[in-house]
């Protein structure tokens, strides 16, 4: 008997161009327009995503997390020291708050006088670089990790993120993999920046779009 794989979703196009999902008990479906195949999640899980050295550093950083998370709020120097111990490049007078999440310190570079606020999430599977005088407001999310959704094994990708000097990532904003936020730019509250942001521009919305230029008046 033929071996059948688990059900997968097939998209079937109707005469009215509406799209409706149906279940097809095969590992591969071919119709007049598209070919569909299942994700090979087992291969994805077997793939070696981290080196042995990086795995060890992740374990040590997890164990050290309470020293960061439960440090008193004003102890910015202590948190700078702790991040440097794990390979981060941290400039002078950097303020990183204790509820912020730094996923992999050795993939972090922060310029002088930058602030990373409460509950900000720095998911730096790939390198994330902050210039000088950057402000990252509370609950902002910077994601330097994604997957190649065109391949069956769903491989992990780590595109770097760069936040240039004098930029501001506002509350609840999202900056996606591979994005460069230009000098002095502002990513507005809850904006979703999946493309580069021009210097001295202000972007808002989802997807982020430029609303106006930023001017600093002395």
Model-identified regions with their sequence ranges:
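Beta-rich strand-turn-strand
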Residues: 171-195
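Flexible, glycine/small-residue-enriched loop-and-beta-strand segment within the central core
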Residues: 71-80, 100-110, 115-180, 206-207, ...
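Terminal amphipathic alpha-helical/low-complexity segments used for targeting or macromolecular assembly
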Residues: 1-88, 92, 133, 166, ...
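Short, electropositive, low-hydrophobicity segments enriched in small/polar residues
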Residues: 91, 149, 192-195, 209
């Amino acid at each position: 008997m033929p071996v059948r794989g688990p059900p997968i979703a097939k998209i079937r196009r109707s005469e009215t161009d509406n799209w409706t999902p149906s279940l097809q008990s095969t590992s591969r479906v071919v119709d007049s327009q598209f070919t569909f195949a299942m994700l090979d999640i087992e291969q994805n899980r077997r793939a070696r995503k981290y080196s042995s050295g990086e795995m060890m550093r992740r374990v040590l950083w997890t164990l050290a997390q309470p020293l960061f998370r439960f440090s008193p709020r004003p102890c910015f120097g202590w948190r700078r020291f702790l991040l440097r111990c794990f390979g981060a490049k941290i400039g002078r007078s950097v303020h990183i708050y204790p509820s912020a999440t730094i996923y992999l310190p050795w993939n972090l570079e922060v310029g002088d006088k930058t602030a990373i606020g409460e509950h900000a999430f720095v998911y730096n599977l790939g390198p994330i670089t902050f210039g000088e005088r950057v402000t990252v407001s509370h609950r902002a999310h910077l994601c330097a990790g994604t997957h190649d959704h065109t391949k069956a094994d769903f491989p992990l990708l780590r595109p770097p993120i760069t936040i240039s000097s004098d930029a501001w990532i506002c509350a609840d904003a999202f900056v996606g993999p591979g994005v460069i936020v230009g000098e002095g730019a502002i990513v507005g509250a809850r904006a979703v920046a999946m493309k580069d942001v021009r210097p001295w521009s202000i972007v808002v919305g989802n997807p982020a779009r430029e609303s106006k230029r930023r001017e600093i008046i002395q």
